[in-house]
């Protein structure tokens, strides 16, 4: 078992993996490639006899690839429901994926939850397709644009916790207090979110369960040629980055 990262020269890296005749690979993150190039690389591995497990929806209809899905639909549904219960009606999502991305469907999940709980509220989605890294820097710049164009926004949902930290920094730039004037929700519930100031409300999942299920899926694919997709349930962990909408305190 090897754990590795390939941020650069991805195609050369994959060619080396194929040459080494590895048994299987678990792809967790999305490389900065076009959809077509990414699909080509995946199927090159499949054709070489490598068993492939993918985190997420990419090539979800393939009968040759196993998938593990984090059930963000339930988590985003809980997040929007919770924000509504706290009086928020102007809720935005900040993303580094464009609308209707082949790599990520959380934008559609957000729109669905808004239709369900706040059908009369605006659906505010800010993204930049040229940005591939969902990190603090990207969310900081996106949130500055968001709060300039939509100062009425009182809550923001982010693709991950790192982006939530960037939103909190951007709020400080506009002298907006978190959570008194802006509530912020991240995803993944990484360890630092429990110690960040303020602590970050996050859509999270059991990392141990995720790791065990990923290993089991790939092992069964390699040893028994069992191809399977599974969902990992999510929860909303409420902390101090969210609160009542302004004017309701």
Describe each model-derived feature in a short phrase.
Residues 34-35, 62, 101, 166, ...:
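Glycine/Thr-rich phosphate-binding loops of Rossmann-like dinucleotide-binding domains
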Residues 40-49, 111-115, 167-176:
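Glycosyltransferases and closely related glycan-assembly transferases
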Residues 1-81, 148:
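Alpha-helical recognition/docking segments in bacterial nutrient-uptake
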Residues 80-91:
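Glycine-rich phosphate/diphosphate-binding loops that line cofactor/substrate pockets in enzymes
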Residues 22-32, 53, 92-94, 150-160, ...:
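Periplasmic-binding protein-like
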Residues 2-12, 31-32, 57, 67-78, ...:
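Hinge/beta->alpha junction and helix N-cap segments in small-molecule ligand-binding domains
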Residues 51, 89, 177:
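Residue-level detector of anion-binding/catalytic polar loops
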Residues 121-122, 142-249:
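Flexible loop/turn connectors
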């Amino acid at each position: 078992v090897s754990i590795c990262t390939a941020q650069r020269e991805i195609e050369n890296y994959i060619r080396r993996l194929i040459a080494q005749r590895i048994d299987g690979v678990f792809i967790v993150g999305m490389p900065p490639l076009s959809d077509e190039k990414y699909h080509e690389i995946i199927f090159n591995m499949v054709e070489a006899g490598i068993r492939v497990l993918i985190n997420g929806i990419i090539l979800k209809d393939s009968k040759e690839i196993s998938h593990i899905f984090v059930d963000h639909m339930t988590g985003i549904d809980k997040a929007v429901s919770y924000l509504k219960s706290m009086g928020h009606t102007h809720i935005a999502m900040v993303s580094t994926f464009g609308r209707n991305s082949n790599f990520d469907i959380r934008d559609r999940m957000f729109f669905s939850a808004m239709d369900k709980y706040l059908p009369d509220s605006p659906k505010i989605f800010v993204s930049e397709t040229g940005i591939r890294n969902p990190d603090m820097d990207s969310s900081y710049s996106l949130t500055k644009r968001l709060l300039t164009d939509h100062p009425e926004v009182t809550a923001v949902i982010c693709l991950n916790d790192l982006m939530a930290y960037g939103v909190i920094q951007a709020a400080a730039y506009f002298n907006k207090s978190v959570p008194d004037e802006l509530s912020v929700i991240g995803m993944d519930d990484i360890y630092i979110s429990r110690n960040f100031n303020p602590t970050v409300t996050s859509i999270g999942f059991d990392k141990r369960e995720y790791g065990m299920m990923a290993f089991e899926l790939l092992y069964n694919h390699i040893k028994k040629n069992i191809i399977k997709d599974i969902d990992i349930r999510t929860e909303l962990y409420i902390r101090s980055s969210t609160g009542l909408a302004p004017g309701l305190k």
